[in-house]
């Protein structure tokens, strides 16, 4: 038996008021496959699939959060379009997916910068907020004021 060691990022939900702008920036179509690394409760994928008719795969390591996401997907009626994988997302095949919707720390994004550059298909879009992708030049940066008075930055990268 092999023992896997992974680093757990805290589950912090993408602010709802930011979600619309992230989805708009990603230019999602019905033909896209969304990848959400550290998908949490699945609400970002659910919103994308409801609005655009696309498919999605989410990775989450925490079994309790996987249960929460799986239940939310079932309740949304999108089980045929959204798959939740209980797996360390560092094991993801980066040739899979056309849009990556990410809310990860800069340290985590740094780990995926090179695999995305090497393996992601051409024209893959990556949308992050709060943290940019190290070694990637954003195609677009949006400054987004929240109702709380805070300002968030959303980044669009394209391969």
Where do the language-model regions lie?
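Conserved SAM/SAH-binding beta-strand->alpha-helix loop
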Residues: 62
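Short beta-strand element of Class I
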Residues: 54-59
């Amino acid at each position: 038996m092999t023992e896997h060691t992974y680093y757990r990022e805290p589950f912090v939900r993408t602010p709802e008021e930011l979600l619309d702008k992230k989805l708009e920036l990603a230019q999602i179509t019905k033909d896209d496959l969304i990848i959400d690394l550290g998908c949490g409760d699945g609400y970002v994928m659910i919103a994308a699939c409801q609005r655009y008719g696309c498919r999605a795969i989410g990775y989450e390591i925490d079994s309790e959060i996987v249960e929460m996401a799986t239940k939310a997907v079932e309740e949304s009626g999108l089980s045929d379009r959204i798959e939740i994988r209980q797996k360390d997302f560092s094991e993801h095949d980066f040739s899979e997916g056309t849009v990556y919707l990410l809310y990860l720390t800069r340290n985590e994004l740094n780990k995926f910068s090179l695999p995305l550059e090497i393996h992601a298909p051409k024209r893959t879009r990556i949308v992050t907020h709060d943290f940019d992708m190290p070694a990637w030049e954003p195609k677009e940066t949006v400054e987004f004021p929240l109702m709380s008075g805070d300002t968030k930055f959303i980044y669009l990268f394209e391969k």
